[in-house]
Design a protein with these regions (language model features):
Chain A
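The canonical Cys-X-X-Cys-His
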Residues: 49, 55-64, 176-180
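Electron-transfer interface patches adjacent to heme c in soluble/periplasmic c-type cytochromes
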Residues: 7-20, 74-173, 183
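Surface-exposed patches in mature extracellular/periplasmic domains of secreted proteins
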Residues: 61, 131-136, 187-196
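Post-cleavage N-terminal segment of exported redox proteins
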Residues: 1-42, 177-206
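Sequence context of c-type cytochrome heme-c attachment sites
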Residues: 28-37, 47-48, 63, 85, ...
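Electrostatic cytochrome c docking/interface patches
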Residues: 30-54, 66-74, 79, 101-103, ...
Length: 206, 536, 396
């Protein structure tokens, strides 16, 4: 350990090896997967909504990767079947998430399909769930005296409604909800799909 | 495909094991030409055996600082060259700590006061939390870590810092980059991946700034005045080679997508901790612990094992963040196995650090910086053990997606790296300014505030996270249970966090006072002979 | 100052560290070797799920026993006055497309078989049987009961399936004869009495809401078919739906969203919505998705498990779990996430409104695997056909 260049070269070689294993090899395997049959590319509006999802930092409380029923009861909570690599073929950036301060959202479009519900919930989550700790997003909405043609007026319980006028959704909110509604992966996963099967129940497949 | 992957997988792990076995054989058969004597590299002649500390109560008297400096005559010249760069970097780092931890506290409070500060987009939880992370990682820890390295590296290499102006330019650019990144995040423009939020356009600036740090340090190492590279130097050289590559590869735009991008994301994010912050922290601890105590580390051969095993195993643990996710089984298993193998380097480093301190417990009483640093070293051991256990599939099922992970991340980045940096700054600044700290009683105050605050933070959030995880795994309990059960612990976390922030503000104010004090009075300790130190 | 401690010049790596390293390495090798097996099991589970969704492992005779014999009887004799016989049925003697179209769409109207007229309430099996299943089943049934052996192809079924989703059930034998095969002979006309009158007020409530809450259809779908944890409402008993809405208000049944909705509804609204959904027909969009064991699920649904004190589902919810008005809802074609969530809700107490609190005890005796098995199996059953009492609950 008296020479710097061999030290640096060895250190870099180890990192190169790690990069091969963790970046390049998985890339080759995942890229060879075709999108899951039934998966649709995002529309322009859904993509704008996805940008909102990133900008507001939804990812820090919501995952998009239901676990297998062998590991956790995600499917029974309505969060959907265990996701596989090819379900994310159109995702850029990936939004897998690592926290579940709120529920997983990979199938929120299937289990909560109502646009009106989502708008209310974004404006004030505690209007629906008293226990919720999700931030309210009033800045995605505006208050108007009267709704104009084309405005989407949100439904609020009497104790949350403004004293005067109506609350209408801004375009950002409508886009975000369009993205959430698009999160519906209720089609089956291919048999050979790629995912972490490390929790698959040991023993004979039934 | 299965066969090839299985083969690749096996080969990879066997390669690591083989390298480890070879290393152990080489160390035990003295094939590597290092000896315990090399551990004395950090001392000047006659210095070993004497504690070196300028913050102890005993040294606050008139002769204290002078006595410490008595052993640093040669280095005083070295220190003077790196002083402007070190001061710039560390003061920037501390500024980011103050701002970043306030954002952390706001984010923490918002989790249990969800209707607080919701009117403005930039104050929403998702952005405030992200500002906190980026400020403390890229602002506080990275800049302070580099600043400490700028001060330590010339000392272990027995020569002055090369290109000492470059780091100052680098620090300015880096500050601009982190600030621009923060503004981008606050305004809703980010790259969408954890730890990689700063837009890649701004990352270019940060990368350029980084090269202004790497170049002087590597040049200094290359032209050292001592044959042996002290263990701290291994960590620094390796980290300086690793981080630019990590940062560059992970930030390449447009080429990644979907789950494949997620593997790049976590390969990067964990390596920021493992191959960047950890070497900066462990390297600093390897210097300061023996330096303050005045005795070499316990076993120099163990430090070799600790270093190379860290490189071999830490570099492949990242995918344990995606356990149970939509990534190939083999890459998850590979990361789990490597995570568990991390016990080896951590035990090696732990023996070295803790035995050295345990044999000299008197020094803990005498030196607050040593208290910070050796407590930081203990937290490194704990955080690493915890991380290895957390990577086990059975444990991960409970802790993944919960606040437990947040507590763990803070044990590593705060309990370990930040504590080491606190201690390093307390040790270094009197030597940089040539004066004692102006308010010595504020140092233990800072120590106890962050220790107590962090204990509240960590214990509370860990318990809360486990309860949250069990609630989520129990299908008979609605999801709302997992939210309600963790809520009191989020409040406890805010309490602990607030105490920590008070500690940080005291630290920042004290640091500022120490700097202003220097400007008010002419520096007392001018280098005796600068030329002899820099001549090559 | 402390005195200088003597250090050895050289220390080998301590033995305990070596032992730990070797032990961890062995564990690592073992774990990696285990990896391949996990992938095999995972694939088998996914392939089972796909197979479950298409039930394509049964031959024609087995399909007949599991899907048809409950009503049409194992010997195809039917039930006098209620279920038409298959033996010598003109519908089977006709071209194979007739049986295929009936299986895909179901029948909702009177048909004549031999000398008897039956009020037809056959469910659609489109969601239950794959193209190949239908070919096997039609071939078996026509060969066995009508001695006809001309073949149907999977392509024919696939083409017909595209239309089936759009057109709904056949409105009695007359429509089948007119559209598919005139050789069926004279068939009874659709009587206007069975034609449900659509309640415009209910329709507005369902599709647009009442201005104070979200429209029912925005979650439950325009055809009341639901998805994932949103239940299918089409074909549930009217009184059952109205009671649930009332129970949300009183808190006997808890669900934050539905409690908000129900509080905005007047009792007469609740009855109107119940009536509206009770006569609604929608193809099934449910499928087994919890990884439950369908064989076990079928046994629990049809026979129960008396060793564990579990009665069969059909004993209360009626044959084929099509429901028994007013109190027992249809379970067939319900989304398994919803069914499973209700079964856990009976245990946790967030739902406590079943007749005689029967469900509390039953649900408590189901373990995780059984709950998933039952929920998944119910999802594979055909949706409830037209209720015999339709139109009457409107009170007109």
């Amino acid at each position: 350990m008296n020479r710097m260049v061999p030290l640096a070269i060895l250190a870099l070689a180890i990192l190169a090896f790690a990069t091969l294993m963790l970046v390049i090899a998985p890339a080759i395997q995942i890229r060879s997967e075709a999108p899951t049959p039934g998966l649709k590319p995002y529309t322009a509006q859904q993509l704008r909504g996805r940008t909102q999802y990133v900008a507001q930092g939804c990812i820090y409380c919501h995952s998009q990767q239901p676990r297998s029923i062998d590991q956790a009861p995600d499917a029974e909570r309505g969060w959907g079947r265990a996701s596989v690599a090819s379900d994310y073929a159109y995702d850029r950036p990936h939004l897998l998430g690592t926290m579940r301060t709120g529920p997983d959202l990979f199938n929120v479009g299937a289990r909560l399909p109502s646009r009106g519900w989502h708008l209310t919930h974004l404006y004030q989550p505690r209007a629906i769930f008293g226990w919720s700790i999700m931030p309210a997003y009033p800045y995605l909405f505006e208050r108007k005296e009267h709704a104009e043609p084309g405005d989407v007026v949100i439904i609020l319980p009497a104790d949350r409604a403004p004293k005067k006028g109506v609350i209408v959704a801004k375009r950002e909110a409508l886009d975000l909800v369009a993205y959430l509604q698009s999160l519906d992966h209720t089609f089956p996963a291919p048999t050979r799909a790629v995912r972490d099967d490390g929790y698959a129940e040991k023993g004979e497949p039934r | 495909m299965t066969l090839t992957i299985g083969l690749l997988l096996g080969l990879s792990f066997f390669a690591s094991l083989l390298a480890l076995a070879f290393l152990i054989w080489a160390v035990n058969n003295r094939q590597l030409t290092i000896t315990q004597h090399d551990a004395y590299t950090i001392f000047t002649e006659g210095e070993a055996g004497h504690p070196d500390d300028a913050t102890t109560e005993g040294s606050q008297d008139e002769g204290g600082a002078a006595r410490a400096h008595h052993f640093d005559t040669e280095r005083a010249g070295i220190d003077a060259i790196s002083r402007p760069a070190v001061v710039t970097l560390i003061s920037s780092g501390i500024a980011w700590l103050a701002i970043g931890s306030i954002f952390g506290l706001i984010a923490s409070l918002k989790l249990h006061w969800p209707d607080w500060l919701v009117g403005e987009a930039w104050l929403t939880f998702g952005r405030v939390r992200t500002l906190h992370l980026n400020m403390v990682i890229y602002g506080w820890l990275s800049m302070t870590g580099i600043g400490v390295a700028m001060w330590v590296a010339p000392r272990i290499f027995h020569t002055a810092l090369r290109y000492p102006k470059l780091p100052i330019i680098g620090a300015i650019l880096w500050n601009v980059g982190v600030a621009a990144g923060a503004i981008a995040i606050a305004s809703g423009w980010n790259d969408g991946q954890e730890w990689l939020e700063i837009p890649w356009q701004i990352d270019i600036l940060i990368a350029i700034a980084g090269s202004f740090f790497v170049l002087p340090l590597l040049a200094t190492a290359a032209r050292r005045h001592v044959k042996h590279i002290y263990v701290t130097g291994w960590y620094y050289i390796a980290a300086l080679c690793w981080f630019p590559i990590l940062f560059f590869i992970a930030n390449i735009p447009y080429i990644y997508s979907g789950v494949q991008e997620a593997t790049v994301n976590w390969w990067f994010a964990h390596n920021v901790l493992g191959l960047w912050l950890t070497p900066l922290g462990v390297g600093a601890a390897y210097y300061f612990i023996p330096k303050i105590i005045g005795k070499p580390i316990y076993s120099y051969s163990l430090s070799l094992l600790g270093f190379w095993a860290l490189a071999l195993f830490y570099s492949q643990v990242g995918i344990h963040h995606l356990i149970g996710g939509p990534v190939p089984t083999w890459v998850v298993t590979l990361s789990i196995v490597h995570s568990v193998m991390m016990f080896v380097p951590v035990i090696a480093v732990a023996i070295n650090h803790h035995v050295t301190v345990a044999r000299n417990l008197w020094a803990l009483k005498a030196s607050v910086p040593l208290r910070f640093i050796s407590l930081g070293a203990v937290m490194y051991t704990l955080a690493s053990f915890q991380g290895s256990i957390e990577a086990l599939r059975s444990v991960n099922s409970v802790t993944h997606f919960t606040q437990y992970t947040v507590a763990h991340a803070h044990l590593g980045a705060y309990g370990f790296v930040s504590f080491v940096m606190f201690g390093a700054v307390y040790h270094m600044l009197p030597r940089i300014t040539g004066r004692s700290w102006p308010w010595p009683s504020m140092i233990p105050a800072h120590f106890w505030l962050v220790v107590v605050g962090f204990a509240i933070y960590f214990i509370g959030l860990t318990i809360g996270g486990v309860l949250q995880g069990f609630a989520m795994l129990d299908v008979a309990r609605p999801f709302s249970d997992s939210v309600q059960v963790v809520l009191p612990y989020l409040e406890i976390r805010s309490l602990g966090g607030a105490v920590m922030v008070v500690g940080h503000l005291i630290f920042a104010a004290h640091f500022l006072a120490a700097l202003i004090q220097r400007d008010a009075q002419a520096p007392a300790a001018q280098p005796h002979d600068t030329r002899s130190a820099v001549s090559t | 100052m402390e005195s200088f401690e003597p250090y050895e010049e050289f220390k080998p790596i301590p033995l305990p560290v070596l032992i730990i390293a070797v032990a961890l390495a062995l564990w690592g090798v073992f774990t990696l070797l285990d990896n391949g097996k996990a992938v095999t099991v995972g694939r088998a589970e996914r392939s089972d799920q796909i197979a479950d969704q298409h039930a394509n492992r049964q031959n024609g005779a087995e399909l007949f026993v599991s899907r048809c014999a409950t009503c049409h009887q194992p010997n195809g004799s039917g039930v006098e006055g209620a279920i038409p016989p298959l033996a010598s049925s003109p519908f089977l003697k006709a071209s194979p497309e007739v049986a295929m179209h009936i299986l895909l769409n179901g029948i909702d109207g009177p048909i004549r078989v031999g000398d008897a007229t039956f009020e037809g309430h056959m469910p659609s099996f489109a969601s239950v049987l794959s193209d190949a299943d239908i070919v096997r089943l039609v071939t078996h049934v026509r060969g066995t009961f009508a001695d006809r052996h001309d073949l149907l192809t999977e392509g024919d079924v696939a083409t017909a399936r595209l239309l089936a989703g759009r057109r709904g059930a056949w409105q009695g034998g007359q429509e089948i004869a007119a559209r598919l095969d005139a050789s069926l002979g004279p068939q009874p006309p659709m009587s206007s009495a069975t034609q449900a009158a659509i309640d415009p007020i209910a329709q507005k409530l369902v599709s647009q809401g009442n201005g104070q809450t979200w429209a029912c259809a925005s979650c439950h779908g325009m055809r009341g078919q639901g998805s994932a944890s949103v239940p299918r409402l089409a074909g549930l008993p009217a009184a059952y739906i109205a009671k649930q809405l009332g129970d949300y208000v009183t808190g006997k049944r808890r669900n934050e969203t539905m409690q908000l909705v129900a509080r905005t509804l007047k009792p007469q609204d609740m009855r109107r919505i119940g009536d509206y959904y009770s006569v609604m027909r929608a193809p099934s969009n449910a499928r087994a998705s919890l990884g439950g064991d369908l064989v076990r699920g079928e046994r629990l649904v049809l026979d129960g498990d008396w060793a564990r004190g579990l009665p069969s589902c059909v004993s209360c919810h009626g044959p084929s779990t099509f429901g028994v008005a007013p109190s027992f809802p249809a379970l067939s074609a319900q989304h398994p996430e919803y069914t499973a969530a209700q079964l856990t809700a009976w245990v946790s107490g967030t739902r406590d409104n079943s007749t005689g609190r029967l469900m509390n005890g039953i649900a408590a005796r189901l373990n995780d695997a059984d709950r998933r098995a039952v929920a998944d199996y119910l999802a594979t059953l055909p949706p409830v056909p037209a209720p015999a009492t339709r139109g009457r609950t409107n009170g007109k």
